[in-house]
């Protein structure tokens, strides 16, 4: 085991604060509408230019072990805020730096760090309650567009695209972000349920121009096992042929003579069918088949439910208005399922989302809700160069997270104003002793910091603006984009409540840990072994003169 360097007290804290400052100073220049760019080196290809706080934070690793510890703790603030709320990473970093900087002064003067932390926690809890009171619901398209624009660094076109997408697929719908093929941003909306499985044979295609199989008013047969024997399918195929309607078969797989017979029938025009594999794997496949059954008003033909293929009737098949099957996707439009059953299924999946422990499971469940309840929208990001594309795509993803957060918990006035207003709840607080009161003061001072930084990045005098905004009431604040004092909500400068709340809570949490640190243990740098001595020189002449 390598030897460790153990550093105590002020020496440890001072080094860690240096690390905090290095990271925070690099991140905070990106804050606000007039935030600056940060250029990140790449091991290959061109550098990345970004105004996204968390992207900058993730790049930073410091050579000094103790400094790096401090930097990594603040990096945790940024990434945690990004994961929870999707935005507010720079605000969280600025708040954490301020709490640490002010707190260290009190710790150095001999105050009890634990009481300081209790004071900080008390102040943050009061501020969060006040933020909830200030918050107002975000419901209109205009408000959603405003939140999206602010999070995308004041790019209104991105905000408009997100609002349009949410309008099309509903608040529960899935919105994904992809690289576009042109210079302009585009929005594609898939109505109905789409899953990522296509036709099993190109002979099913009946629309050669689009290379898809289109079924109008079809039956849908759902089976959880492989189908290889055509005899199993014959009874149900005969019933469908009599009804004179097409059939979509979704099974674990369709192979051998079963697939060959379906293809031959399709080519001869006897029965229009398409076979596709069931989406997902394992338990998720069963759940998705059940979703499709509820959406189309059919049943999954499975041994568990006591149903077999040979005895299947038209009553057990699902129905839809139209189904399109491409090479890689199948879209079911206007399934014949009962609205009550679909709603019950959505409710059931939502309960599973709340209980889900992994992000992956939660994401997959959310997709299932969207496919049942709304639809899927794809925002295709357009840009001139790859560097711009990456930067813009990151901003669109940020804005998307922020708008979801706004719809979830509402909005507060942006530009650092909400934190200034929330200070009123803290000003009246008193702690048990002087040290706790100092902790409350630390948070009071820190809550000015985001506004100060926004103004500083805009090239104005911060103290004057902070005093003017603090003297105002309600949504009155400073719009750094125009340099005017306005009603922030009317001007469209709003932040999701969840973003502001999460930023403050995460910043206080990590800053509190740093303040109560009294020792740091780091690996000693490895001493390079000296190079071995060189080989002796070559042999001289042998001196064999004849």
Swiss-Prot record:
Entry EC no(s): 5.6.1.7
Subcellular location: Cytoplasm
Domain of life where this protein originates: Bacteria
Keyword Phosphoprotein: no
GO CC entries: cytoplasm
Oligomer and partners: Forms a cylinder of 14 subunits composed of two heptameric rings stacked back-to-back. Interacts with the co-chaperonin GroES.
Protein name: Chaperonin GroEL
Biological source species: Burkholderia thailandensis
